[in-house]
Protein backbone atom coordinates (compact mmCIF):
# COMPACT_ATOMS: atom_id res chain seq x y z
CA UNK A 1 0.00 0.00 0.00
CA UNK A 2 1.38 3.39 -1.01
CA UNK A 3 1.09 6.14 1.55
CA UNK A 4 2.91 9.46 1.51
CA UNK A 5 2.37 13.10 2.22
CA UNK A 6 3.60 16.03 0.16
CA UNK A 7 4.12 19.33 1.92
CA UNK A 8 3.68 22.50 -0.12
CA UNK A 9 5.08 25.65 1.47
CA UNK A 10 5.00 29.25 0.34
CA UNK A 11 4.78 32.75 1.71
CA UNK A 12 1.75 35.00 1.54
CA UNK A 13 2.74 38.67 1.39
CA UNK A 14 -0.10 41.12 1.87
CA UNK A 15 -0.42 43.82 -0.78
CA UNK A 16 -3.17 45.54 1.22
CA UNK A 17 -4.49 45.35 4.77
CA UNK A 18 -6.18 42.03 5.56
CA UNK A 19 -9.18 41.55 7.81
CA UNK A 20 -10.12 38.05 8.90
CA UNK A 21 -12.22 38.79 11.92
CA UNK A 22 -13.16 37.18 15.16
CA UNK A 23 -15.99 37.72 17.59
CA UNK A 24 -16.07 40.93 19.57
CA UNK A 25 -18.93 39.80 21.81
CA UNK A 26 -17.07 40.84 24.96
CA UNK A 27 -15.30 43.94 23.64
CA UNK A 28 -14.51 46.72 26.06
CA UNK A 29 -15.95 50.19 25.54
CA UNK A 30 -13.83 51.96 22.94
CA UNK A 31 -12.34 48.72 21.61
CA UNK A 32 -12.15 47.91 17.91
CA UNK A 33 -15.54 46.86 16.51
CA UNK A 34 -14.08 44.01 14.47
CA UNK A 35 -10.68 42.67 15.59
CA UNK A 36 -8.54 40.29 13.53
CA UNK A 37 -7.81 36.71 14.55
CA UNK A 38 -4.51 36.53 16.41
CA UNK A 39 -2.19 33.82 17.66
CA UNK A 40 -2.90 33.60 21.41
CA UNK A 41 0.79 33.03 22.18
CA UNK A 42 2.37 35.86 20.14
CA UNK A 43 -0.67 38.14 19.80
CA UNK A 44 0.26 38.52 16.11
CA UNK A 45 -2.31 38.19 13.30
CA UNK A 46 -2.76 34.80 11.64
CA UNK A 47 -4.59 33.54 8.58
CA UNK A 48 -6.70 30.54 9.62
CA UNK A 49 -6.31 27.42 7.51
CA UNK A 50 -10.11 27.27 7.30
CA UNK A 51 -10.16 30.69 5.58
CA UNK A 52 -7.56 29.61 3.03
CA UNK A 53 -9.35 26.30 2.40
CA UNK A 54 -12.78 27.90 2.07
CA UNK A 55 -11.66 30.67 -0.26
CA UNK A 56 -9.66 28.33 -2.47
CA UNK A 57 -12.52 25.83 -2.65
CA UNK A 58 -14.99 28.59 -3.48
CA UNK A 59 -12.83 29.95 -6.31
CA UNK A 60 -12.16 26.48 -7.74
CA UNK A 61 -15.85 25.59 -7.63
CA UNK A 62 -16.52 28.40 -10.10
CA UNK A 63 -14.07 26.78 -12.53
CA UNK A 64 -14.51 23.04 -11.95
CA UNK A 65 -18.17 22.59 -11.04
CA UNK A 66 -20.78 22.35 -13.76
CA UNK A 67 -23.17 24.37 -11.62
CA UNK A 68 -22.96 26.32 -8.38
CA UNK A 69 -22.88 23.98 -5.37
CA UNK A 70 -25.47 25.25 -2.90
CA UNK A 71 -25.13 22.49 -0.28
CA UNK A 72 -22.46 20.09 0.98
CA UNK A 73 -22.21 17.15 -1.36
CA UNK A 74 -22.92 19.10 -4.54
CA UNK A 75 -19.29 19.73 -5.50
CA UNK A 76 -17.90 17.78 -8.43
CA UNK A 77 -15.73 14.71 -7.91
CA UNK A 78 -12.35 16.44 -8.09
CA UNK A 79 -13.22 19.11 -5.50
CA UNK A 80 -14.80 16.52 -3.20
CA UNK A 81 -11.67 14.42 -3.59
CA UNK A 82 -9.36 17.31 -2.63
CA UNK A 83 -11.41 19.23 -0.07
CA UNK A 84 -13.69 16.55 1.30
CA UNK A 85 -17.42 16.29 1.30
CA UNK A 86 -19.62 16.89 4.32
CA UNK A 87 -22.75 15.44 2.79
CA UNK A 88 -24.53 12.98 5.08
CA UNK A 89 -25.09 10.42 2.35
CA UNK A 90 -21.58 10.46 0.84
CA UNK A 91 -19.21 11.82 3.49
CA UNK A 92 -15.60 11.74 2.39
CA UNK A 93 -12.42 13.18 3.89
CA UNK A 94 -10.37 15.32 1.53
CA UNK A 95 -6.75 14.83 0.55
CA UNK A 96 -5.73 18.36 1.55
CA UNK A 97 -4.83 19.73 4.96
CA UNK A 98 -4.56 23.52 5.25
CA UNK A 99 -2.49 24.75 8.20
CA UNK A 100 -2.95 28.11 9.88
CA UNK A 101 -0.56 30.64 8.30
CA UNK A 102 1.53 32.37 10.95
CA UNK A 103 3.04 35.86 10.76
CA UNK A 104 6.78 35.48 9.99
CA UNK A 105 8.37 38.85 9.17
CA UNK A 106 8.24 40.69 12.48
CA UNK A 107 12.00 41.45 12.40
CA UNK A 108 11.80 42.83 8.84
CA UNK A 109 8.95 45.16 9.77
CA UNK A 110 10.69 46.15 13.02
CA UNK A 111 13.75 47.21 11.00
CA UNK A 112 11.48 49.53 8.99
CA UNK A 113 10.26 51.19 12.19
CA UNK A 114 6.85 49.53 12.27
CA UNK A 115 5.34 49.82 15.75
CA UNK A 116 2.19 47.75 15.28
CA UNK A 117 1.48 44.77 13.04
CA UNK A 118 -2.18 45.67 12.77
CA UNK A 119 -3.92 48.91 11.93
CA UNK A 120 -7.39 50.20 12.70
CA UNK A 121 -9.30 51.46 9.69
CA UNK A 122 -12.23 53.74 10.37
CA UNK A 123 -15.20 53.14 8.08
CA UNK A 124 -18.66 54.52 7.86
CA UNK A 125 -21.90 53.26 6.38
CA UNK A 126 -24.69 55.67 5.61
CA UNK A 127 -28.32 54.60 5.88
CA UNK A 128 -29.72 55.35 2.42
CA UNK A 129 -33.10 56.40 3.76
CA UNK A 130 -32.29 58.37 6.91
CA UNK A 131 -28.76 59.47 5.92
CA UNK A 132 -27.67 58.43 9.42
CA UNK A 133 -23.99 57.52 9.77
CA UNK A 134 -22.87 54.26 11.33
CA UNK A 135 -19.13 54.56 12.03
CA UNK A 136 -17.10 51.47 12.88
CA UNK A 137 -13.49 50.46 13.44
CA UNK A 138 -12.01 47.50 11.60
CA UNK A 139 -8.66 46.01 12.53
CA UNK A 140 -6.44 44.77 9.69
CA UNK A 141 -3.08 43.05 9.41
CA UNK A 142 -0.85 45.67 7.74
CA UNK A 143 0.34 45.48 4.14
CA UNK A 144 3.74 43.83 3.60
CA UNK A 145 3.01 41.36 6.39
CA UNK A 146 4.23 37.89 5.46
CA UNK A 147 2.58 34.64 6.53
CA UNK A 148 3.98 31.10 6.21
CA UNK A 149 1.60 29.03 4.07
CA UNK A 150 1.57 25.24 4.44
CA UNK A 151 -0.57 22.72 2.61
CA UNK A 152 -0.34 18.93 3.02
CA UNK A 153 -1.44 16.57 0.22
CA UNK A 154 -2.02 12.93 1.14
CA UNK A 155 -1.22 10.16 -1.34
CA UNK A 156 -2.76 6.70 -0.94
CA UNK A 157 -3.18 3.74 -3.30
CA UNK A 158 -6.43 5.16 -4.58
CA UNK A 159 -4.94 8.62 -5.23
CA UNK A 160 -1.61 7.64 -6.77
CA UNK A 161 -2.83 7.87 -10.38
CA UNK A 162 -4.49 11.23 -9.74
CA UNK A 163 -1.56 13.14 -8.21
CA UNK A 164 -0.72 15.05 -11.39
CA UNK A 165 -4.34 16.04 -12.01
CA UNK A 166 -4.79 17.01 -8.35
CA UNK A 167 -1.71 19.23 -8.38
CA UNK A 168 -2.90 21.00 -11.52
CA UNK A 169 -6.10 21.87 -9.65
CA UNK A 170 -4.15 22.92 -6.53
CA UNK A 171 -1.93 25.22 -8.63
CA UNK A 172 -5.03 26.66 -10.33
CA UNK A 173 -6.46 27.34 -6.87
CA UNK A 174 -3.32 29.08 -5.65
CA UNK A 175 -3.23 31.26 -8.77
CA UNK A 176 -6.92 32.15 -8.40
CA UNK A 177 -6.32 33.01 -4.74
CA UNK A 178 -3.42 35.25 -5.72
CA UNK A 179 -5.65 37.13 -8.16
CA UNK A 180 -8.56 37.49 -5.74
CA UNK A 181 -8.88 38.70 -2.16
CA UNK A 182 -8.88 36.91 1.16
CA UNK A 183 -10.96 37.82 4.20
CA UNK A 184 -13.63 40.48 4.45
CA UNK A 185 -14.22 43.68 2.48
CA UNK A 186 -12.28 42.64 -0.62
CA UNK A 187 -14.36 44.89 -2.87
CA UNK A 188 -13.16 47.83 -0.77
CA UNK A 189 -9.47 47.03 -1.19
CA UNK A 190 -8.86 44.65 1.71
CA UNK A 191 -7.04 41.32 1.50
What positions do the PLM features span?
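RNA-binding basic/glycine-rich loop and surface signature characteristic of RAMP-family CRISPR effectors
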Residues: 1-126, 130-191
Amino acid sequence: MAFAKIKVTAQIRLETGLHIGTSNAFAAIGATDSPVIKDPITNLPIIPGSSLKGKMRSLLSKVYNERLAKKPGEDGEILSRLFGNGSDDRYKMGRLIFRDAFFVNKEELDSLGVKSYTEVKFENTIDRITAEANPRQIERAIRNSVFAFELIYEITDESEAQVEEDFKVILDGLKLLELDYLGGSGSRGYG
